[in-house]
Amino acid sequence: MLVLGLLVAGAADGCELVPRHLRGRRATGSAATAASSPAAAAGDSPALMTDPCMSLSPPCFTEEDRFSLEALQTIHKQMDDDKDGGIEVEESDEFIREDMKYKDATNKHSHLHREDKHITIEDLWKRWKTSEVHNWTLEDTLQWLIEFVELPQYEKNFRDNNVKGTTLPRIAVHEPSFMISQLKISDRSHRQKLQLKALDVVLFGPLTRPPHNWMKDFILTVSIVIGVGGCWFAYTQNKTSKEHVAKMMKDLESLQTAEQSLMDLQERLEKAQEENRNVAVEKQNLERKMMDEINYAKEEACRLRELREGAECELSRRQYAEQELEQVRMALKKAEKEFELRSSWSVPDALQKWLQLTHEVEVQYYNIKRQNAEMQLAIAKDEAEKIKKKRSTVFGTLHVAHSSSLDEVDHKILEAKKALSELTTCLRERLFRWQQIEKICGFQIAHNSGLPSLTSSLYSDHSWVVMPRVSIPPYPIAGGVDDLDEDTPPIVSQFPGTMAKPPGSLARSSSLCRSRRSIVPSSPQPQRAQLAPHAPHPSHPRHPHHPQHTPHSLPSPDPDILSVSSCPALYRNEEEEEAIYFSAEKQWEVPDTASECDSLNSSIGRKQSPPLSLEIYQTLSPRKISRDEVSLEDSSRGDSPVTVDVSWGSPDCVGLTETKSMIFSPASKVYNGILEKSCSMNQLSSGIPVPKPRHTSCSSAGNDSKPVQEAPSVARISSIPHDLCHNGEKSKKPSKIKSLFKKKSK
């Protein structure tokens, strides 16, 4: 009875007199009391009529409905702040935002109130009874727990306690006894989460998932693909840039190695030049010693000759003649040995200066190529340093990867490397070629007096002027060799001083002074006029004067070469030049098959040069040369700056060959003054024999050591007239020695 009275009193006060943790016991006790004493309950029926569960519509008959009603009353009290029995719009909005922690409560608020602005407990109960959540089964509740609450670990506890939709209001009010003791949820955060989710479905109905947005999925997929593709592209570009940079660094290292090898090669070049200078000094010392010996032999011969001339007795004169003859024989043997050591013919001294000038011009072109290669190297280094600086910044790697600067720098490095390689190959080939030329010729080419001195000495007597371009280093010949061959007139016709030469010297130098081509064709009459001084008839051994040609200006296609100020107006064609050349050569050929000079003439004539064997036998001439002939020969030799020196057989040299002429091996070739260049360094022969050192000209040494008064007497002994060559008089060695002996004895 006491418990029943308490229930009635609690119902009058809104069922809040009994604590929540005792409500289960009260319900259980009231049910037991009602079952045990139905008579008492029947006696108190007016009191039960005031129970709110029975007064509600629809009424609550079961225990679960009672628990649900109590939970709804608790929720209504929490939302009703002013305790007026109704939930206004402001109160529900504040509860949704603060207690349920919803930021956007518009949809929830409209779903809760609908058209009713004042919600009472009866309205809340009716909505709960008609709600879909109220009719949830155990499976629906478990699905809600797993999918929406996301607490699948409590599925077993819900299943054991048979939690259905009608039990959710008890979870929404957070009964500790029910949540902890029955559902066994010990985690506070899980209890709070479960309470908020249960309160949501009790007040606002079941949660509905929004429709699946395929556009978002597509956009997300495309974004993922783009992101992955961008990452892959960035990775590949970074890898490619690193490979490019590594390759560039490797090329730069190889470039530095090539530069170092070039420096080493230049050091070797300097050492080789120093060795060449030392060899030249030693060579000069040997030549000086040989000249001393020759001068001593000449003095001894002169002394014996003076003794022979001053002797009165025939016997003493014969003895002196025999001694002199012995000296001549010794000198002749020595000359023959030297002639055997030398090649078949000698080259004039002017070729040495022309080769030295060619070497200096080639060195200047090499220096220009070297400067260009060094400039390319500096540019490549600067670009590589810029790339390094760019890669050190934050966005430098991406900038370098997406730009074409790496390819450009790589191309510049390869170009600089190629230029250095070509420069090194050119330097090696040039060094080897000029060393071989020096070995074959037997004189210095790389070590010379310099380009200004060579230019002034070789172009001092010329009437045409060469003006180089500004961009090219100063050198006398602005065009190539082919340009000079085609544009310049024949050298013989340009200089009138060469026409006053004796026929012997003319014939000897005609093959060297002949031009390869003619520029302007001429008529037969001027050609015959030009043939006369170059190919003299045997009946006219000397021509004192020559036809004069009117100088005219010759236009040149090369802007670097100025017009010729004085040159003949008409030039010979190739046929007439060949006729002059062969007519001049035939004067040197003597039809004597038994002599040694015949074989030499046949081999030397094929090489387009005068026979050198006549130099040896010029000393054995039975005829004396007068002072007028010697002076005429010297004057003609001084007037011609381009022809070969005629003093091959010096009066004081006793048949020695001229020491300033070049020595060529049989394998060497000379094509009209142009040095043939080898196509490949591998084809160059490294076994070319080194010629003997040259000797200074005997005639020059004799002129320095002897007074001027002794020249006629010496010439009478050792010189041969040019008429011997023109008339074809030639004999063997024994006959010449005997005739010399007879003449001298007289």
From Swiss-Prot:
Effect after changing residue 91 to A: No effect on inhibitory activity
Domain of life: Eukaryota
Tissue: Expressed in all tissues and tumor cell lines examined.
Modification after translation (UniProt): Glycosylated.
Extracellular compartment segments: 15-218
All residue ranges annotated as the SAM domain in the record: 136-204
Sample GO molecular function, one term: calcium ion binding
Phosphoprotein listed as a keyword: yes
Function field: Plays a role in mediating store-operated Ca(2+) entry (SOCE), a Ca(2+) influx following depletion of intracellular Ca(2+) stores. Functions as a highly sensitive Ca(2+) sensor in the endoplasmic reticulum which activates both store-operated and store-independent Ca(2+)-influx. Regulates basal cytosolic and endoplasmic reticulum Ca(2+) concentrations. Upon mild variations of the endoplasmic reticulum Ca(2+) concentration, translocates from the endoplasmic reticulum to the plasma membrane where it probably activates the Ca(2+) release-activated Ca(2+) (CRAC) channels ORAI1, ORAI2 and ORAI3.
Protein name per the record: Stromal interaction molecule 2
The species this protein was found in: Homo sapiens
GN (gene name): STIM2
